[in-house]
């Protein structure tokens, strides 16, 4: 194919090439971030208490001298991507030369170990080989007439079976840590949306894992009788207190009764048919409360008309993650509305929260 020498067409071609190459090599930025997390760069700078020069950072990380220039090139990309910032500092005493030092930015502060907002386990889980290797089977998956996830097509087992085949596995622990770290971020949401839980006497957190979210709610509303409802192998060894109870069961069969049902990061794991069953069981769980009961959903509500292209891209990325791992989905407002009304609810309210998620209140 011959391309015109017209300047406009050449410019378009070059921009198209840049666009394609950028998306092809996006994985490099992800893996560089994972490397920074594994090395503990954010921890080193945080513990140092001030920006660190390249030599200080390499020394703190106990890197071989031959890796200092490699570290510089990783930091150059990560700084360009907004994870670190560069500043100029004076050299050591007696040295008049100035040096570049690296400091933390808001995104890299999310990698500081031990902080409630630490999301290192999210990075670790999302970029785990089990999450990445399956994509090599995508052509086979498209060409097979089987109702299975891409993960199943690649590994021969569902993600849940892979996760639960060994209750002591590091993979299960990593997944639980990732869910717990995301739940800790919920505290910010809770502080801004206390009204959602006011007036309630009881709440059941469906798929609540080890109870991270429920404990945060319980801190602010200690009178609230909370139940964490999850699979028996998840909650079997957990202990609560007078107002915090752990119950094992199957949300597709029934959900414990309460004034409100919380579904945080649950429905996007499932297709519409399965989600409809969960919502109907949730409606039954709050039936004793009449019109005063409600279901509280925290999930993504996709808005493809948003001016924030980065936000929309993240939401669409999540949609493909849910599809390929679970045959689940992220939903648009119209899809949420249909699902909610099909489950027999009378009204709902969607409030954007927490960056890319939404809080959806559903009423009988």
Curated annotation (Swiss-Prot):
GO molecular-function terms, A-Z: 2,7,4'-trihydroxyisoflavanone-4'-O-methyltransferase activity; isoflavone 4'-O-methyltransferase activity; O-methyltransferase activity; protein dimerization activity
Annotated catalysed reactions: a 4'-hydroxyisoflavone + S-adenosyl-L-methionine = a 4'-methoxyisoflavone + S-adenosyl-L-homocysteine + H(+); (2R,3S)-2,4',7-trihydroxyisoflavanone + S-adenosyl-L-methionine = (2R,3S)-2,7-dihydroxy-4'-methoxyisoflavanone + S-adenosyl-L-homocysteine + H(+)
Biological processes annotated in GO: methylation
Keyword Kinase: no
EC top class, as a word: transferase
Amino acids binding S-adenosyl-L-methionine: 206-209, 230-231, 250-251, 264
Domain of life from the UniProt record: Eukaryota
Annotated EC: 2.1.1.46, 2.1.1.212
Keyword Nucleotide-binding among UniProt keywords: no
Keywords: Methyltransferase, S-adenosyl-L-methionine, Transferase
Positions of the catalytic residues: 268
PROSITE patterns: SAM_OMT_II
SUPFAM superfamilies associated with the record: S-adenosyl-L-methionine-dependent methyltransferases, Winged helix' DNA-binding domain
The protein's role, per its UniProt record: 2-hydroxyisoflavanone 4'-O-methyltransferase involved in the biosynthesis of the phytoalexin medicarpin. Has also an in vitro (+)-6a-hydroxymaackiain-3-0-methyltransferase activity, converting the pterocarpan 6a-hydroxymaackiain into pisatin. No activity with di- or trihydroxylated isoflavones, including daidzein and genistein, or with (-)-medicarpin and maackiain. The dual activity for either 3- or 4'-O-methylation depends upon substrate availability.
Quaternary organization: Homodimer.
UniProt similarity note: Belongs to the class I-like SAM-binding methyltransferase superfamily. Cation-independent O-methyltransferase family. COMT subfamily.
Name this protein carries in UniProt: Isoflavone 4'-O-methyltransferase
Organism: Medicago truncatula (Barrel medic)
